[in-house]
Amino acid sequence: VIEEYDLSFLNLNTTKSKLLEIETASHGLVSKGFSTYNHGMPVLMYPELTGLRNIIKQYVKLYCIKYNIPPLKFINSWFNISQAGNKLKAHKHEESVISGAFYISGSTSLIFPETSVKPYSGLLVLFSSDLVHYTEEETEERIIISFNTDYL
């Protein structure tokens, strides 16, 4: 199940500034861009992102209540900066229950088997981790925070 939440009321300038300070590396799913996936501290654990982490936690909790899922915890989080021309390869998130994507900036749709989501700044997308998803070629820079969850 895929749910979209509009968090565009958040001021993301501080979040974006902090993300751009964090050291990144290449990522096998990101052909043109950078990531913190498996590189350094989980991005949602940075003290500067505590407010955002707490807001996302509340939406994960609402999702769990709606779909009768036991309480969850974050098990990892990272961000990707994808440049124009990047394609996110089809994949799913193993060993996770619910995954999420929070868009700082976005361009190309996030595509699932039966639907797609058009991203915008401040969009939070929560989905079952076993759903395969990908993007077509990005038309502009995309900055996204992604995360996985597991049972408490």
Regions found by a protein language model. Give the residues of each.
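Catalytic core of non-heme Fe(II) oxygenases with the double-stranded beta-helix
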Residues: 71-137, 141-152
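Non-heme Fe(II)/2-oxoglutarate
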Residues: 1-69
